[in-house]
Amino acid sequence: GEGGAPILLPAEPSPLPPLGSVITQTLNWERRHRLMRVHTALHLLSVVMAYPVVGGQIGEVKGRLDFHLPAPPEDIAAIETALNRLIGLGLEVSTRWITAEELAAQPELVKTIYARPPVGKGPVRLVQIGAEDAPIDLQPCGGTHVANTREIGPVRLGKLENKGRDTRRMSLNLA
């Protein structure tokens, strides 16, 4: 909204309360936390499968990333093991801000090919997984994340799907 103020919309179509009314806002924490777990797990999947990301989707119990990947990896079980190992390390997840100029000077931070971070609208939020001096993941992201990778819990990978020329889809599910 105006000046960056949040915009709240009713869950169901209904008239808005009169200006100045006292209202109660609730957050479905269980749903949000599941989304946070899946989202953070997808960050770690992009570490284990270190290929450019061309798409993705986050759901409550599952998510997916589409990778620019000409040939499929041979051992999906090894990828799942590596992913669950990273989750089990209990890595801290933190955020910090950089300028658009700093991001432009570090293009390797952007893992997505088509969904570029918004620039020209102020600072860019970075999400970091791991130690400040040696993060295992650092990329622009405006989403919600867990505070520690152990919050994710174990995950299972689905089958790798061929989604067209040089695009492979990897899905994951919360176990």
Q: What feature does the model see in each segment?
A:
Residues 1-175:
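Active-/binding-site microenvironments in catalytic and ligand-binding cores
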